[in-house]
């Protein structure tokens, strides 16, 4: 059976080239530019930048975590990956810094208690404890370019970057012992990061320098 395609609600110009990280904090979008190494706080109703922040590296991914945010940051010289805590009032914490397993990892999601980190080339999502130890491995079966929790379920972009990029959005129930990953719809652009604002999903079309709002069919 051929999958339907996502329903785009809107495309908006990114305030900076190569939009990469994206998170919804309940009121605003937080976008991280890969090329400029900057973080932008966006009012989605007026589509204007409220603040600009400088992270300690490349902001590969972000997720909101109960009033703070976590960013996957690639640090020089080898783009080693760390999860860094960010508080809007005080900025990035030097103490609260988690080393990603094998210094690799990209996208983040949060279930209200634990962080989940995906590893692109290992086709998996890892559930981490507070110190960054792996407490669970969920096989996704393909490269992962974003994931987010909605109603206790994980929604995930999976596919391949090769041969022109081919992606679907899929769903799985992390409460299952061996979650079955079910594809829902085709994503017809090179999607990077996935977040949900309570009504619609959001992602970055990085190569087009656009941020996309969409719904499921």
Language-model features and meaning:
Residues 191-217:
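Blade-level signature of beta-propeller repeat domains, shared across WD40, Kelch, NHL, RCC1
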Residues 10-15, 52-56, 97-102, 137-142, ...:
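Surface loop/turn motifs at the tips and blade-to-blade linkers of beta-strand repeat domains
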Residues 49-66, 73:
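Blade-loop segments of beta-propeller domains
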Residues 30-36, 71-80, 117-122, 156-164, ...:
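Conserved beta-strand positions in repeat-built beta-propeller and related beta-rich domains
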Residues 10-37:
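Beta-strand-rich domains and repeat architectures in extracellular enzymes and scaffolds
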Residues 17-22, 57-65, 102-111, 140-151, ...:
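Repeated scaffold domains used in trafficking and secretory/extracellular systems
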Residues 43-47, 87-91, 129-133, 173-177, ...:
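Short loop/turn segments that connect beta-strands within beta-propeller blades
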Residues 38-40, 78-84, 125-126, 164-170, ...:
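Structural motif
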């Amino acid at each position: 059976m051929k999958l339907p395609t996502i329903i785009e609600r809107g495309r908006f110009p990114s305030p900076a080239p190569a939009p990469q990280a994206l998170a919804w904090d309940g009121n605003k979008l937080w976008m991280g530019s890969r090329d400029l190494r900057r973080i932008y706080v966006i009012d989605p109703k007026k589509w204007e930048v409220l603040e600009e922040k400088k992270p300690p590296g490349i902001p590969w991914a972000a997720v909101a975590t109960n009033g703070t945010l976590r960013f996957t940051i690639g640090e020089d010289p080898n783009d080693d990956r760390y999860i860094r805590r960010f508080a809007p009032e005080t900025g990035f914490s030097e103490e609260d810094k988690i080393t990603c397993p094998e210094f690799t990892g990209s996208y983040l999601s949060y279930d209200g208690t634990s962080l989940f980190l995906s590893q692109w080339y290992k086709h998996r999502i890892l559930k981490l404890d507070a110190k960054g130890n792996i407490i669970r491995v969920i096989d996704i079966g393909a490269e992962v370019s974003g994931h987010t929790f909605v109603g206790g379920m994980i929604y995930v972009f999976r596919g391949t970057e090769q041969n022109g990029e081919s992606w679907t959005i899929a769903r799985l129930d992390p409460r299952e012992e061996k979650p079955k990953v079910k594809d829902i719809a085709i994503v017809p652009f090179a999607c990077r990061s996935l977040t949900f604002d309570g009504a619609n999903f959001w992602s970055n079309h990085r190569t087009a320098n656009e941020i996309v709002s969409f719904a499921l069919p």
